[in-house]
């Protein structure tokens, strides 16, 4: 397995993510999306002594989460040696130590992808509301786009494990619609998608970049995608 980790100014958190992955013997691709802090330096220093393979892709300027995930995924696929690809953010809100639980759910159900679900009591109210509408929108979009019914309870959760074979030729969209785009295309390919609860911790260093404007932009992109593809 290999984890794709988009990171932007995560010098306070990225090392914790990598250390947990090392304990699990999970390789990592960190995509530093134009950070102005020491994120890349920390990754480089860790990689020198790590017991896992740690790859660093550095964008000179911030290109957005979708582009970061796209670059990381294409790189991981080019290595041609991983059955599963994990997606987890670099802010340590999600815990890598939940990976075994996600993998067990994936294998026990013979699924092709497992999406993390955050318990609502751990999510700020404004995020609960935006996530509810985003999940409804994406579930309806999937039905229109793939002619298959899926109900996603937490489509905005970026913590996922997906079989590498389903990520070939994947379109990642732009900005914060990336999780939605991946869900749409997995459904179109007939992938079996299951969900599993994961831990989440909102802390002072973890900054939310989601705004109402961005949520509306995600909706616009999803609608545009299903009718133009």
Swiss-Prot record:
One BP term from GO: protein N-linked glycosylation
Name listed for the protein in its UniProt record: Uncharacterized protein MJ0544
InterPro entries: Glyco_trans_2-like, Glycosyltransferase_2, Nucleotide-diphossugar_trans
Domain of life of the source: Archaea
Record organism: Methanocaldococcus jannaschii (strain ATCC 43067 / DSM 2661 / JAL-1 / JCM 10045 / NBRC 100440) (Methanococcus jannaschii)
Gene3D superfamilies per record: Spore Coat Polysaccharide Biosynthesis Protein SpsA, Chain A
């Amino acid at each position: 397995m290999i984890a794709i980790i988009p990171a932007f100014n995560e010098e306070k958190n990225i090392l914790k993510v990598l250390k947990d992955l090392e304990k699990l013997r999970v390789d990592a691709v960190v995509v530093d999306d134009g950070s102005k802090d020491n994120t890349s330096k920390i990754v480089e220093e860790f990689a020198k002594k790590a017991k896992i393979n740690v790859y660093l892709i550095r964008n000179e300027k911030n290109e957005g989460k979708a582009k970061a995930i796209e670059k990381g995924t294409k790189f991981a696929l080019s290595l041609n040696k991983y059955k599963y690809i994990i997606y987890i953010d670099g802010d340590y809100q999600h815990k890598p130590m939940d990976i075994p639980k996600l993998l067990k759910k994936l294998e026990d159900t013979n699924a092709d992808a497992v999406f993390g679900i955050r318990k609502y009591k751990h999510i700020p109210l404004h995020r609960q509301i935006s996530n509810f509408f985003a999940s409804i929108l994406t579930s309806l979009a999937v039905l229109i786009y793939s002619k298959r019914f899926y109900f996603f309870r937490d489509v905005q959760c970026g913590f996922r494990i997906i079989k590498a074979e389903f990520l070939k030729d994947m379109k990642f969209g732009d900005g914060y619609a990336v999780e939605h785009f991946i869900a749409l295309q997995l459904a179109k390919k007939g992938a079996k998608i299951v969900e599993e609860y994961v831990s989440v911790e909102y802390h002072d260093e973890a900054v939310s970049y989601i705004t109402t404007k961005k949520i509306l932009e995600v909706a616009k992109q999803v609608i545009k995608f299903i009718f133009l593809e």
